[in-house]
Amino acid sequence: SDKVAYTCRKKTGLEYAISTNSDIYVYDLNTKETKNITEENKGYDTNPQYSPDGKYIAWQSMERDGYEADLNRLFIMNLETGEKRFVSKAFESNVDAFVWGADAKTIYFTGVWHGESQIYALNLANDSVKAITSGMYDYEGVALFGDKLIAKRHSMSMGDEIYAVALDGLATQLTQENKLIYDQLEMGKVEGRWMKTTDGKQMLTWVIYPPQFDPNKKYPTLLFCEGGPQSPVSQFWSYRWNFQIMAA
């Protein structure tokens, strides 16, 4: 390609510290000219990726300046016409990692919904979104390799491992980095529960039981409340906030 796309927040001092208004710039290697293609948007514009056929560019975009927890949307632009489109409207959550499909007609992305980060397929013909994976775990990062997607997967009971995911959702574990350790441990059951809040809404909570839990016995309880509140309590694995250790 004769063009390079990059993201930058061209501000200094206090304005740089409090603003989230970054933009996508395209530098032409032949003319040495730089063009801002997201100047009208006032929030974060990040992670530009060209389509395999070179006809489009996709990027993540937040709408409002100074609001770093804004909805992370997915946009594409037709490089010939300059037409831009908000393509992830059908997914009412953040678009996290994403990658173009080989045919440039599909974008695969990860996103959290109901406490799980799954892999989704976005059909650019009609902007419809379909979940490829399901289950009580999180996928993070996604790359295309042939006819499969390569991604990290973890849960509250397992640290990161690498998986190959077929486009029909069939996942094959490629790494077993901690198998010897897991074989010596017994993990407690993890259960999702929906609770009605004081304002009448439904809230997802996670219950992590001790290993060898006996329902006839009483156990001390620890309540973990997520701070931020810029991230959900999904099926994340943490060496600092490890729920299996807390439950044990």
PLM feature spans:
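Serine-hydrolase catalytic core recognition
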Residues: 140-248
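Hydrophobic beta-strand positions that form the internal "hydrophobic ladder"
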Residues: 4-5, 54-57, 106-107, 149-150
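A flexible loop/linker signature enriched in serine peptidases of the S9 family
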Residues: 1, 8-23, 36-49, 58-75, ...
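Short loop/turn segments that connect beta-strands within beta-propeller blades
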Residues: 28-32, 78-82, 123-127, 166-169
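Residue-level detector of Asp-centered blade-edge/turn motifs that repeat once per structural unit
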Residues: 52-53, 102-103, 144-146
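Conserved blade-ending motifs and adjacent loop-strand segments that build the rim/top face
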Residues: 87-97, 130-141, 175-186
